[in-house]
């Protein structure tokens, strides 16, 4: 398969880069537009990185490629492509490998031209394009050393502040560094004024991490001897210069005054106090009673690290016993006194009263001689404490929870009273409804226990006359029988006037004139007479049958004996169930 899109994009991007004119903004815009498309066309559909040993489907028209190591994994496309879902059709594509190498070479070429400087100076698109160029340059072989132009390119993006004494010629101070073999990638971050070396081994750079015997010597690269300097006298300008760069990386470094003495309290400005309040988690706890030592690390470069004490709050604190001036209590919340008894009428808002922000912004008055210091509190739990009516203390529980428990108890009592008045022990459905009304999740340890009611003993026989607690004999008089409504037969009915037509087997009684044969059978079932067959005369004797049905069954059975010839004609009885 021929990757047409990637090839066309490479040709167009190469033509624009080779014919680039620094004064042509249109060409610069086209390059910034084509480079991301070219990079996207060479991306793996599984991991999203630049293709390594690319493979592509053979019988497909789509432009989806994956790395050889990503074969068989799920692609990130939504919805998935139906052309390339079968990994058995993927084979190695040499043209894609050539295009990936061409992309790397193109990125290397851009870093050595004036186009790279224009990309860095551009504010709107510099980050995206620099990421693409860095992605392409990282795939270079480790044996090849990047050129010095990449280092100078990084210097233009974030210049290195000099820690030595200012010289008359600033270019002369940078010349030893530019001639050194130290090389920095374009996308590398600069922390504390010196670049990082992430992803490279320690052997690559000859950095001697300072020991306690030699705390201030830094040797970079064995082939170049850099002037050894004493940096302890120039620490304040280093911190002041790099403070702006460190804010973007989440590290907060405050400038120290030069006349700090052991045992004195550390002076903090208003801005530093506010900054420490906003970024408490990222602030390092520093103690000024120890001399700062300059240390160098491989991951972060040389940086200023002060010996710290692990405290409960990440703010700058003083170990001096004498505290003077206004104390800033906004960093640590005010803890309620444990031995003080409070009345129940006091509000919870009086427990913790934070210092108004206006006092911090305005700072101390003109008459105050001592600066703003931070009071060091003892390590006790800072959980808000609420008082119990008996004088003890418990962790703070909001008022809404306590009020809700009281309301739950009241609602539970009212609900139980209503359910007791409405409940009738004779009906099971109402008992179930009462149980559902009783809240199960509202019970607290101090709430009253649930009252259990015993079910009334069910009475045998018919429900007629027992629908109420006091049975009445006039229940079915002029009303529908409850047994009839439930389609049940009346057994041992105690009411008078009940005309329930349901039998014990669940069928209805039929009148004698409706279906004579079936009415006769129902009468037989009601009386419990076992007769295998009942003979009925033909249509000629239908009148006699009607008369017989009106008469008692015993007379009918006595009239028709087995000796009668009319019994030879058996009746065909049909039961419609």
Curated annotation (Swiss-Prot):
GO molecular function terms noted in the UniProt entry: histone H2B ubiquitin ligase activity; promoter-enhancer loop anchoring activity; ubiquitin protein ligase activity; zinc ion binding
Binding locations of Zn(2+) 1: 44, 47, 67, 70
Positions carrying Phosphoserine: 447
GO biological process: DNA damage response; epigenetic regulation of gene expression; positive regulation of DNA-templated transcription; protein monoubiquitination
Protein name: E3 ubiquitin-protein ligase MSL2
Species, as recorded: Mus musculus
Record-listed Zn(2+) 4 binding positions: 462, 483, 490, 493
Keywords from the UniProt entry: Chromatin regulator, Chromosome, DNA damage, Isopeptide bond, Metal-binding, Nucleus, Phosphoprotein, Transferase, Ubl conjugation, Ubl conjugation pathway, Zinc, Zinc-finger
Pathway membership, UniProt: Protein modification; protein ubiquitination
Region annotation Sufficient for interaction with MSL1: where it falls in the sequence: 1-116
UniProt crosslink position (Glycyl lysine isopeptide (Lys-Gly) (interchain with G-Cter in SUMO2)): 375
Encoding gene (name): Msl2
Family that this chain belongs to: Belongs to the MSL2 family.
Subcellular location per the Swiss-Prot or TrEMBL entry: Nucleus; Chromosome
Null mutant phenotype: Perinatal lethality. Both male and female embryos show developmental defects ranging from mild to severe, including eye malformations hemorrhage, and brain and kidney defects. Defects are probably caused by defects in gene dosage and loss of biallelic expression of target genes: in mutant cells, one allele remains active, retaining active histone modifications and transcription factor-binding, whereas the other allele is silenced, exhibiting loss of promoter-enhancer contacts and the acquisition of DNA methylation.
């Amino acid at each position: 398969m021929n990757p047409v899109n990637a090839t066309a994009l490479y040709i167009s991007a190469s033509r624009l880069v080779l014919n680039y004119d620094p004064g042509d903004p249109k060409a610069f815009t086209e390059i910034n537009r084509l480079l991301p498309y070219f990079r996207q066309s060479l991306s793996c559909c599984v991991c999203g990185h630049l293709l390594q040993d690319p493979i592509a489907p053979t019988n497909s028209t789509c432009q989806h490629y994956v790395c050889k190591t990503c074969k068989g994994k799920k692609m990130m496309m939504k919805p998935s492509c139906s052309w390339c879902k079968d990994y058995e059709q993927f084979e190695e594509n040499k043209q894609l490998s050539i295009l990936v190498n061409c992309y790397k070479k193109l990125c290397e070429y851009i870093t050595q031209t004036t186009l790279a400087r224009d990309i860095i100076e551009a504010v709107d698109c510099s980050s995206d394009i620099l990421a693409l160029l860095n992605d392409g340059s990282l795939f270079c072989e480790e044996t090849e050393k990047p050129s010095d132009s990449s280092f100078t390119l990084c210097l233009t993006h974030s210049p290195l502040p000099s820690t030595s004494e200012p010289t008359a010629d600033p270019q002369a101070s940078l010349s030893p560094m530019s001639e050194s073999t130290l090389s920095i990638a374009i996308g590398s971050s600069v922390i504390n004024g010196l670049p990082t070396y992430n992803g490279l081994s320690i052997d690559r750079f000859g950095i001697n991490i300072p020991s306690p015997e030699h705390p201030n010597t830094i040797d970079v690269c064995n082939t170049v001897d850099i002037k050894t300097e004493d940096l302890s006298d120039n620490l304040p300008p280093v911190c002041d210069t790099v403070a702006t760069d460190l804010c973007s990386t989440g590290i907060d470094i405050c400038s120290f005054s030069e006349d700090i003495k052991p045992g004195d309290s550390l002076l903090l400005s208003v801005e530093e106090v506010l900054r420490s309040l906003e970024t408490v988690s990222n602030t390092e706890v520093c103690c000024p009673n120890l001399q700062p030592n300059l240390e160098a690390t491989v991951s972060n470069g040389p940086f200023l690290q002060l010996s710290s004490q692990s405290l409960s709050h990440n703010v700058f604190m003083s170990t001096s016993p004498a505290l003077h001036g206004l104390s800033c209590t906004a960093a640590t919340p005010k803890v309620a006194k444990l031995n003080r008894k409070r009345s129940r009428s006091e509000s919870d808002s009086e427990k913790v009263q934070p210092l108004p922000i206006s006092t911090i912004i305005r700072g101390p008055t003109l008459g105050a001689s001592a600066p703003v210091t931070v009071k060091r509190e003892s390590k006790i739990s800072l959980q808000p404490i609420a008082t119990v009516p008996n004088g003890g203390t418990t962790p703070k529980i909001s008022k809404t929870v306590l009020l809700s428990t009281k309301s739950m108890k009241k609602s539970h009592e009212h609900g139980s009273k209503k359910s007791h008045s409405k409940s009738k022990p004779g009906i099971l459905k109402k008992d179930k409804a009462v149980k559902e009304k009783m809240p199960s999740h509202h019970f607290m340890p101090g709430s009253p226990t649930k009252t259990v009611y015993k079910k009334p003993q069910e009475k045998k026989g018919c429900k007629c006359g027992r629908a109420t607690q006091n049975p009445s004999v006039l229940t079915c008089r002029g009303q529908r029988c409850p047994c009839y409504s439930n389609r049940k037969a009346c057994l041992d009915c105690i009411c008078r006037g009940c005309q329930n037509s349901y039998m014990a087997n669940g069928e209805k009684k039929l009148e004698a004139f409706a279906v004579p044969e079936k009415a006769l059978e129902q009468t037989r079932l009601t009386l419990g007479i076992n007769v295998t067959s009942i003979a009925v005369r033909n249509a000629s004797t239908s009148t006699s049958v009607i008369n017989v049905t009106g008469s008692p069954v015993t007379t009918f059975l006595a009239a028709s004996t087995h000796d009668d010839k009319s019994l030879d004609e058996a009746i065909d009885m049909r039961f419609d169930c």
